[in-house]
């Protein structure tokens, strides 16, 4: 019998494991029963449970084919979730307690109500009912469960935007649909009007997941908007006028899992890039930003209009990727192996009037590792370089971002202590490590677990 210390449990207040062993076939002491007892107390609810597992019919010294234990951890057929209580009574290794029987009857009743048409209709009625909170700042959702559709309409607050060139009125809209085979389609649109320059911007993106098992997905997008030269830059640089240009773009993408663990993504896009040097801005806003930044915000960069056609391909592979097979989808689990990936981005010259001409490639590995009581870790190691730089525009540079002042960044994505943003053209080697201790340190201090503080650490290198 083993009980874990409370301060080592991020999700529970009590967790105990009891094990029974028996001398099987006069050959070996083996586990025959395992009981997990656990409970959790929070401000909102109290929960407790017991899970019993029985082991029997051992076959000792059995020889298995090398491919017998594959990456598929379990599989469920379509009728698995339709089994009644008689079936479970026949396969359950020990009888249920009276309290457990009552709980099952209660949950079965609740599930029957939740899955009934009348209940789903009532949920739709509540969701679709307009009220002042939805109208003013939350936004209005319209749900129709029989069709599997949802519409998300903007609130009054969300129609007000401030962007390059001043205040704008925008109308965002989202449509989402899922069918009985868990195939989905979503439409995300936004149209905005700028008062100072009397211009119209907007975007439309259509995404279709046509296969839920191999994650087969394609998308099409149209965009006219103000875009940052380096969208991943520090927030303090995002305030500068000199970081923006006007992008008129059309793009398409496709991705799917080819074999277990092997994913392929491909994207093509065409951009008609234009300078914002002639756009009007609010002088009072520029002055305010200059005081905050303690340096000139600069003007939008002036450049000759040009077109750019791109092709992107990424191949990623996770060896021995474990998964669960559900009736309509595949659930990917964390692997003990890292994910290896390769990216190639091509600036395609001449075709459709494109002016860019470059090749950039990147290789790397990434992984999320569960380390038991010590916590969880994430790391990324990558290297990249331009193989061809015949015509690389400012927007296409490979940037290393500066650290954010005041705010801390994710150590797995950037370098906190870097004092400036700069471009790299030669091969670089970059690594990041991020560790979340899950209370391994703070939970040992009385009352700290209830506060909800998190301890994290990380670091990186760039060569």
Regions found by a protein language model. Give the residues of each.
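Gly/Pro-enriched, hydrophobic low-complexity segments
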Residues: 1-70, 382
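Exposed, low-structure sequence patches enriched in small/polar residues
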Residues: 76-463
